Every structure is written in structure tokens, then in C-alpha cells.
Amino acid sequence: MRVWVFFVLCLAGKALAAPQQDALPEEEEVIEDVPAEETVGTNPVQVDVGEFDEAINEEEEEEPSENPCLNHHCKHGKVCEVDESNTPLCVCQDPSTCPTSVGEFEKICGTDNKTYDSSCHFFATKCTLEGTKKGHKLHLDYIGPCKYIAPCLDNELSEFPLRIGDWLKNVLVSLYERDENNNLLNEKQKLRVKKIHENEKRLESWRPHSELLVRDFEKNYNMYIFPVHWQFGQLDQHPIDGYLSHTELSPLRAPLIPMEHCTTRFFDECDIDDDKYIALEEWAKCFGIKEQDVDKDMIV
């Protein structure tokens, strides 16, 4: 999986790098060996939400076994131990017991601007801070060691959603072209992307440069509506409630920040009412989608 995420992040870096500036070095992912979880989303830059999910607190129990911990699953940052009555329970993992990272790509930066050796170290530390103000504020910020992120200027921020929107459209077209028997898209999604794909083939001889992104968005506006809805649906998973939390955004924003310095400001300003959640209407507005074109039924 490490190789897969490394490949897709490279792909995303190439697709998203701002043409007016040098691409930031790609400082990749946070991967630890955890039980396989159901894949969330099919966006190739979107890292499995399980890697960053701070909100799923279920501790599942199955049939008793010799070792009660074998079938007792704990969330990230916790490990299973048994008490005096041989009952399994989840306790915070000691960060010193985490495996040593093997490269820079395993390091992550927290919102405390501290570099953690791996996701294991980060979540174990966060667990020990549960119930404290510091722990409540601590989240995974981005993949790779902490580094200087240049401020996002107003003119750069205005271009960012156009570039991301164009990229989302291209991601969907690519999935459609590769989706013969892979079930990357469901049937309803394929029907919506089919028209976008046909239009893309017609326009493939002309691809927009940065200064032409606005013109392309205005001219081909209808081609951007579904990709924006689709990406929202890919992220809105825990729970599926029509709102994106910081945790739900992490699979997309964490790989982007080292490559796109406007990522944090963009998502912060998407939260128009500043309630720490991004509703579909706020998300669509951030990408320039008109209010009358926002449709919950488009998230299929």
C-alpha cells in the first residue's frame, strides 16, 4: 500500500502543482500496518480515511477466544490489554512502543507544528492527551515533516478552487476510462461522467493554462458540477450526514498541504459559518458552483 499511495501522491503533485511557482517537494504518507478497512472513496490522491480517522471510536467484540484481545479492535492510538478478570479493554499505546519509521515519507506534521515519526506515534500521543485542551486541539495537519508553508495570497486563493475543480474533473474522467470491470464508479456515476468524458474528448486539443482557468470554468461550467458533488460524497463517510469534519477532510487535505500551500486557507474559508463543519452548500460555493445547482441527490 505504501508504494500505491506514493504513486498516487506523485500523480496528484504533477496534476495540482501551480504553474506559476515551483512544485513543493512531495513529502508523503502516513502508513502503519492496521487491519484492512473498507475503502472510502476512489479519488487516487485521497488516502484511506482509516489512516487519519480520529472520530471512529467503536471497540468491536466478537466470539471469545483464548486471547480475548485477538478479536477486540481498538481505534488508532490504543492497544488492547486484559484486566484482572481477563476482560479486554483498550488503553493508550505508549509512543515508545511504536515501530521506528523507515523514511521521511512516514513522518507527519501535527497541528501543534510538531513532527511525529509516524501515524502510530501521533495517535498514541493524541490518546495520552485525551480529555485535555491540548488533546482536543491536536489533529493531523499534513503528511511529511513539518516545514515552512508560505502564506496563501489572495490572488493564489482565487485560482486554487479552479485548479482543484479541474483536477477533480480529470480524476473522474480517468476513473471512467479505466473502469471496465473494476467497479471504480457505480452505474449512476458512470452515466453522469459519460457526458463529461465525451466533452473532454471534444476539448482535448485545448487544455487550459493557469491564466485560462477562469475562462474554461465559465465556458464549461456544467462539467464541473458533478465532480464537486462527487468529491464531497467521497469524504462524507463518518458519519454520512451532509457535513465534512476536520477528520473527514484529512484524507484529501493532508496529502495536498505540502504541495499546495493554499490548502489550509481554502478549507478554512469554506467553513463560512465557522462551525468547524463544511456543509454541502458551503463546499459547492467554495468551488464556484451556483446555489441553484447544488443537489444532494447528485451525491450517489
From Swiss-Prot:
Disulfide bonds join C69-C80, C74-C90, C92-C127, C98-C120, C109-C146, C152-C262, C270-C286. Residues 86-148 form the Kazal-like domain. It comes from the Eukaryota. One of its GO terms (biological process) is regulation of synapse organization. Residues 68-90 form the Follistatin-like domain. Residues 1-17 form the signal peptide. Belongs to the SPARC family. This is SPARC.
